[in-house]
Amino acid sequence: MKRINILNEDTANKIAAGEVVERPASVVKELVENAIDANSKNILIEIEEGGSSLIRIIDDGDGIYKEDIEKAFLPHATSKIKESEDIYSINTLGFRGEALPSIASVARVNLKTKQETEECGYEITIEGGKFSEVTECGVNKGTIMEVRDLFFNVPARKKFLKTTSKESSLINDIITRIALSNPNISFKLFNNGKKIIHTYGNGNMKDVIRTIYGKSIVENVLYFEDTSDIATIYGYVGKEAIARGSRNNQSIFVNSRYIKNRSLGIAVEQAFKSFSTVSKFPFFILFIEIYPEYIDVNIHPTKSEVKFNDERFIFKKIFGAVHTSLKEEVFSTFSIPEEVNEAISKNTNLNIEEITFKIEEEQEKVKFNTNHLSQKNICSTQGNNSINKHIYDEKHKTDTNIPLNVNIPVDLKSDHIKLEDDNNSIPNKEVICDNNEVKYESSYTSDSNQYENSCKSDVDKESKSKTTGTSELVKEKIPKFPAIKIIGQYNKTYILGEYAGTLYMIDQHAAHEKIMFEKYLNDIICGDIIIQPLMIPTVIDLSMDDYSYFEENKDVFKEAGFTIEDFGGTSIALKEVPYFLGKLKPKNLFLEILDNLKNLGSGKTTEVKYNAIATKACKSAVKGNDSLDELEMVKLIEELRYIDDPFHCPHGRPTIIQFTSTDIDKKFRRIV
């Protein structure tokens, strides 16, 4: 083994500079952050030859005390902290005291500075770590820092620099990020005498976005915001029109510090994906303002990464804020005229009335007064070919005591529609529409009296116990788009409708899929999940990592309709699964949901998220090439109007698109 040597100060500084000063952009970042910490309002950056020959930073900040000028260039000298505990309450961008000595050890540096109370300024020159005397000079309040001939004494580092244009581009990028996080500061960047960036420091974030990215970008961004006890999440996310094939236009800031965090970026991308049909990455600018004690900024040499105490919590807050903003934007494009809204509001004070079952000798009649709906019917809405049959199959089994749930819209008027039957256990069922009354008939005989009485008892109890709560929920059910008039079906896949001169096309599969998807989530909220026992429990062997996530989310699986028991070690046994999802592969479903939880973090049961539920919902939804009659189409559209988000299927594909008369006239060149 070789002998141990103690490195001299010059060698140690050059090695340290390798971590902090990677390239000219690193120097610009450190010096501009120092200017921001000095309370500057105007910062000018000048570079030549990509920053390798000259970097000049001019600010109007507080300046440096004469006695501190030399100390500022000593290793670990800083005005930001005094003790190690101060790191966990830091509110400045710099704090280590490494940048200036690192830069001074590999470049020729000249510093001029003046405080407001001083009569003159002071100047010092450092070349390769060697100091000159501090002398008086004429200079305005603030600091001027010149860095020339970067890496002049470390040629091995200099040869690894990229081309001048590439290094200039990296400097441009870092100033862009810093300007976005400081809209109250005016930034000017000059490259070889040419102005590249100029922000005005008026505090208007959209003005900064317009200056940096252009008018087309600022016109296609949406604001989002969410707050909690420890953090505030806010920023802008781009619409689908400005999505790109790379993540270059994505910025994340924590307490005004530009960072890189893949997980938080995925939170925005997942929310964006719910409303996008393109395989591109969204434009976004994300700000996280959080109490310093909940993060650790001292985990990376360049401070470009931050560690959160609870990153899953931050992930969910970001996802929720972005998702809500995008959802509201979609809803605004399908607005209902004001006069229609007023008419709807006058008719939404529904009285909740008990559902009564009339038992006759040879038939069971379920009478629904469509002006008096129970909330359970609203929660259980379905649509299918045959839509009513799907509901019946799901809720009405001969070996269970589950009440029948059917929901037919008020405005359906048809004489006599027979539904095809491919289930021998439910013979001769049909729907009879008589004015505003809808009767569901079946050939169950008096042998079913026990079932009928059980249904009546269950519904009576539920009606009495939930009248108050459900009436409040019903009032919240409002249509998200107008009551369009059905005019036909195209290619057995798309439903055509019109309203006020606008043509609507609805993807029947995507629409029904979304209705089923929201029904499952609503069932979880209502505690109304129907489960099916497995004849043979499915045993799944999990890794230690997967098992820990399962343990953490046991309640999530339970409330979503899964009965799971430990099977020794890290193995589990699936005994019961949600009946709603029909025929499925329990193991695959469980692992899909578990993967979602690993990506999104644990949370409310309604966050047993999109992939697993949406994929399974697809399998029993109305398909393309399914012929629907007018009653079925009207029912499907009416149900779609009242769900929380009728405009996108769980995969993010649109369920409904619209064409105004102007759009169509342009296609036929009636107007230009």
Swiss-Prot record:
InterPro entries: DNA_mismatch_repair_CS (IPR014762), DNA_mismatch_repair_MutL (IPR020667), DNA_mismatch_S5_2-like (IPR013507), HATPase_C_sf (IPR036890), MutL/Mlh/PMS (IPR002099), MutL/Mlh/Pms-like (IPR038973), MutL_C (IPR014790), MutL_C_dimsub (IPR042120). Keywords: DNA damage, DNA repair. Residues 443-469 are annotated as: Disordered. One of its GO terms (biological process) is mismatch repair. Gene3D superfamilies: 3.30.230.10, Histidine kinase-like ATPase, C-terminal domain (3.30.565.10), MutL, C-terminal domain, dimerisation subdomain (3.30.1540.20), MutL, C-terminal domain, regulatory subdomain (3.30.1370.100). The keyword DNA damage applies. Pfam families: DNA_mis_repair (PF01119), HATPase_c_3 (PF13589), MutL_C (PF08676). It comes from the Bacteria. GO terms for molecular function: ATP binding; ATP hydrolysis activity; ATP-dependent DNA damage sensor activity; mismatched DNA binding. Residues 455-465 have a biased composition (Basic and acidic residues). The keyword Metal-binding does not apply. Residues 443-454 have a biased composition (Polar residues). One of its GO terms (cellular component) is mismatch repair complex. This protein is involved in the repair of mismatches in DNA. It is required for dam-dependent methyl-directed DNA mismatch repair. May act as a 'molecular matchmaker', a protein that promotes the formation of a stable complex between two or more DNA-binding proteins in an ATP-dependent manner without itself being part of a final effector complex. PANTHER family: DNA MISMATCH REPAIR PROTEIN MLH, PMS, MUTL, DNA MISMATCH REPAIR PROTEIN MLH1. Belongs to the DNA mismatch repair MutL/HexB family. This is DNA mismatch repair protein MutL. It comes from Clostridium botulinum (strain Eklund 17B / Type B).
